[in-house]
Amino acid sequence: MRLHLLLLILLLFSILLSPVRGGLGPAEGHCLNLFGVCRTDVCNIVEDQIGACRRRMKCCRAWWILMPIPTPLIMSDYQEPLKPNLK
């Protein structure tokens, strides 16, 4: 009986402390909600880029979808660095 209890406790801790990270990132979830697909670097010819999923992944969606879905932009605090004016 004690062996079963010990195995059950070890199984519970191994499930709770697993190093696997589940779920999607917020940008990937946003892309899937807009019926998009995360692709590396470039979208197909018949797809429009509607956002970004990760660092080098873009959110692509086919432009001929019958039901129009608004594509809200995700605003971020990042701003491009100012370029010096050369004379």
UniProtKB/Swiss-Prot annotation:
Signal sequence span per UniProt? 1-22
Q: List the disulfide bonds.
A: C31-C59, C38-C53, C43-C60
Expression triggers: Down-regulated on the ocular surface following inflammation and bacterial and viral infection.
Q: Does the keyword Hydrolase apply?
A: no
- SUPFAM superfamilies in UniProt: Defensin-like
- Localization (cell): Secreted
Which tissues carry this protein? Constitutively expressed in all regions of the ocular surface with predominant expression in the uppermost layers of the corneal epithelium and lower levels in basal layers (at protein level). Also detected in some keratocytes in the corneal stroma (at protein level). Expressed in all layers of the limbal epithelium with no expression found in limbal keratocytes (at protein level). Strongly expressed in the conjunctival epithelium with decreased expression in basal layers (at protein level). Also strongly expressed in tonsil tissue (at protein level).
Q: Which GO terms describe its molecular function?
A: CCR6 chemokine receptor binding; chemoattractant activity
* Keyword Transmembrane included in the entry's annotation: no
Which keywords belong to this entry? Answer: Antibiotic, Antimicrobial, Defensin, Disulfide bond, Secreted, Signal
GO cellular component terms given for this protein = extracellular space
Task: List the GO biological process terms.
Answer: cell chemotaxis; defense response to bacterium
Please classify the protein's predominant subcellular localization into one broad category.
Answer: secreted
Regarding protein family, the annotation reads:
Belongs to the beta-defensin family.
Q: What does this protein do?
A: Has antibacterial activity.
Entry protein name: Beta-defensin 109B
Gene expressing this chain: DEFB109B
